[in-house]
Amino acid sequence: MAHLILIRHGQSLWNAANKFTGWVDVPLSERGRAEATIASCKLRDYRVNVCFTSMLMRAIETAVITLTECDDICGGKIPIIKHEADDENWHGWDNYDGDPAAELPIYPTATLDERYYGDLQGLDKAETTAKYGKEQVQIWRRSYSVRPPGGESLEDTRKRVYPYFTNRILGHIKQGDNVLVAAHGNSLRSIIMILETLSEEEVPKVELATGVPIVYELDKAAHMLSKAVLTN
């Protein structure tokens, strides 16, 4: 038995400003950092062994705060950002002669990045709705296969998330590790679609609050045994 903990990043500055963010690398707001701190307290009874995040700072910030505000989560280990050997952004600079057993690895990967919103990125959501109409914007935001102009659909996001999740992340689950994934609304919807076998009609309706952990209990075959949403 293992636990998979999913957490959407805390509120970002552009969440607060009601802008489409996508791949724009915006940091957490003060509220977002507080949400991650609260999440850490909620997870104090879970011992995390490994963490995966997107490459975007709002997800990495959320992961680091969640893992460091409550020492019980790490079991005395030090969270260290690591890179896969085949990561094109890795230059070997984080190599050192240390004890891996004293580390809690955090693996950033672009496969967990938010859905790319294309031409909508940086636009105010209310102004975009006024320009294109509520129905059209809702289709761009919450349909499964329709892409916003120049961007990705949820289906596109799932296609890039699926191989990494099933091979890399579930590999740790099958070893009995407790895994934290700090990512984004649509990359997490893609994971939830797999875990809960949701249909293409069901998954766009999944709502994820910022900074709220979702804890799945999984067996060694990665089948879901239980789910808990750790709200206030």
Swiss-Prot record:
Active-site annotation: 9, 114
Pathway: Carbohydrate degradation; glycolysis; pyruvate from D-glyceraldehyde 3-phosphate: step 3/5
Gene Ontology molecular function: phosphoglycerate mutase activity
Entry keyword annotation includes Isomerase: yes
Superkingdom of origin organism: Bacteria
Tagged with keyword Isomerase: yes
Chain positions recorded as substrate binding sites: 8-15, 21-22, 58, 114-117, 125, 141-142, 185-186
Catalytic activity: (2R)-2-phosphoglycerate = (2R)-3-phosphoglycerate
GO biological process: gluconeogenesis; glycolytic process
Keywords per UniProt: Gluconeogenesis, Glycolysis, Isomerase
EC number: 5.4.2.11
Residues carrying the site annotation Transition state stabilizer: 184
Pfam families, alphabetized: His_Phos_1 (PF00300)
Class of this enzyme: isomerase
Matches recorded under PROSITE patterns: PG_MUTASE (PS00175)
InterPro entries in UniProt: His_Pase_superF_clade-1, His_PPase_superfam, PG/BPGM_mutase_AS, Phosphogly_mut1
UniProt similarity note: Belongs to the phosphoglycerate mutase family. BPG-dependent PGAM subfamily.
NCBIfam families (alphabetical): pgm_1, PRK01112.1
Function noted in UniProt: Catalyzes the interconversion of 2-phosphoglycerate and 3-phosphoglycerate.
HAMAP family, per database record: PGAM_GpmA
Protein's UniProt name: 2,3-bisphosphoglycerate-dependent phosphoglycerate mutase 1
Gene: gpmA1
